[in-house]
């Protein structure tokens, strides 16, 4: 709760979108009590919109309305897209808060989109019609990076829940059924698969998969071997970036060889 106050208290939001709860590792987690508590500490709020995602019983939260109520009274209108300046604020990211209260980092429309298009199309080989997945929460900058794939005409694939529930192959089943072209994850996840002797290629076809991205920590040479022996012949890219630039410092290069334990290119 304090983490929300430390961040949102600085920007004084007027509208806040929340979910009543979420599912993880086979369990339902209720968020309503926390929402009621921290929204009471944000005096700038004029409206709290709650998505009935986990179908939990409602509690009374000041100035709240369900998303379903909004839809019931909604009449479709033509969307008007406002033209703004290249550096017009797009979204606010936050520093980790390890050296004090998290710092607000404002990213602009033009710079963010151009950088992401460059990284997607040139470094990650994303094309129109591709199906791009990155296992990430909405609070990680990889979420913002993933969403920008829409700008290339790709389909963004989303997964909500544990990557190991009901078993360690759940994400690969998703990748196979939905024909992922790009699969993004963390080095820790790949290491977990390796330690548990998970062999996705023995269970799934993964015929459309062409790129695997790994980030969050260095990808060991043994994990490179694991991917090529147990997933298939793909472009494996160990990438690294940061919230402050909401993009990458180093990532893949599709036109040069992949060498085990090494990052391909610096931007």
Residue locations for each model-derived region?
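Conserved pre-ATP/AMP-binding loop-to-beta segment of ANL
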Residues: 49-50, 61-94, 101, 109-116, ...
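ANL superfamily adenylate-forming
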Residues: 15-86, 196-197
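Short beta-strand->loop structural element characteristic of the AMP-binding/adenylate-forming
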Residues: 1-38, 104-106, 155-163, 192, ...
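Conserved helix-loop-beta element of the AMP-binding
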Residues: 14-15, 33-48, 131-133, 157, ...
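Short Gly/Pro-enriched turn/cap motifs at secondary-structure boundaries
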Residues: 81-84, 261-267
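Gly/Ser/Thr-rich phosphate-binding loop
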Residues: 152-154, 180-184, 194-259
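Conserved AMP-binding/adenylation subdomain of ANL enzymes
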Residues: 111-131, 140-181, 196
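Conserved S/T- and glycine-rich ATP-binding loop of Class I adenylate-forming
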Residues: 89, 95-98, 120, 132, ...
């Amino acid at each position: 709760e304090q983490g929300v106050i430390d961040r949102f208290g600085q920007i004084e939001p007027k509208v806040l979108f929340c979910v009543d709860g979420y599912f993880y590792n086979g369990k339902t987690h209720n968020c309503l009590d926390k929402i009621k508590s921290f929204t009471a500490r944000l005096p700038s709020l004029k409206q709290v919109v709650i998505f009935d995602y986990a179908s939990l019983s409602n509690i009374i939260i000041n100035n709240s309305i369900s998303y379903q109520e909004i839809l019931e009274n909604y009449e479709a209108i033509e969307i008007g897209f406002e033209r703004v300046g290249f550096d017009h604020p797009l979204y606010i990211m936050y520093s980790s808060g390890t050296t004090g209260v998290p710092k607000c980092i404002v990213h602009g429309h033009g710079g963010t989109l151009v950088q992401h298009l460059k990284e997607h199309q040139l470094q990650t080989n994303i094309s129109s019609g591709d199906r791009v997945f990155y296992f990430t929460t909405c609070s990680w900058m990889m979420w913002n990076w993933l969403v920008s794939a829409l700008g290339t005409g790709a389909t963004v694939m989303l997964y909500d829940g544990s990557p190991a529930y009901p078993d360690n192959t759940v994400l690969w089943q998703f990748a196979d059924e939905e024909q992922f072209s790009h699969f993004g994850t963390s080095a820790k996840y790949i290491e977990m698969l390796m330690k548990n002797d998970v062999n996705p290629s023995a269970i799934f076809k993964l015929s459309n998969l062409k790129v695997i991205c790994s980030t969050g920590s260095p990808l060991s040479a043994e994990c490179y071997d694991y991917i090529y022996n147990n997933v298939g012949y793909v472009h494996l890219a160990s990438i690294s970036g940061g919230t402050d630039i909401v993009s990458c410092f180093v990532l893949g290069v599709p036109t040069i060889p992949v060498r085990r334990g090494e990052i391909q290119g610096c931007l």
